[in-house]
Amino acid sequence: MIPTDSEYYTVVKFALDQCEQFDHYLEAWKVCEKKFWQYNWIHAYPNAAIEVIALYYCENSLDRCINMMSMMGQDVDCNAAQVATMFGAAYGIEAISEKWLKPLPEELLTYVRGHEKTSIADITSFTVECVNRALENR
């Protein structure tokens, strides 16, 4: 599905080739990390490699996949979201552990000065307020 003449294809193929050469996911990642060192931690290329590697080694377990992606680092939350979506589409909701399906607690503790203790509802309201103000001022 990925055009074979694209850069993205070469990244995915490189990661898959490493998976086929090594018995452990961290060995495959070490080679990919070295190859993609020049890219920022949120760049698509190292994160695509992480997703490929984790999916290859996780034995169809989302929990294992998320754990592996966390151990490799980079943009962990975005990688987990993309892979969880793939698991849900491919295997159904039954493939996703209940702990990932439960609602988050309302209270949030942060490192943001002045907002060390907040809530999802407060953040949601503030976001809507900002969007409405931006729309009014355009």
Task: Describe each model-derived feature in a short phrase.
Residues M1-G73:
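Accessory "access/gating" subregions that flank catalytic or transport cores
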Residues E51-V131:
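Catalytic phosphate/nucleotide-handling subdomain of diverse soluble enzymes
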Residues V131, L135-R138:
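Bulky hydrophobic segments
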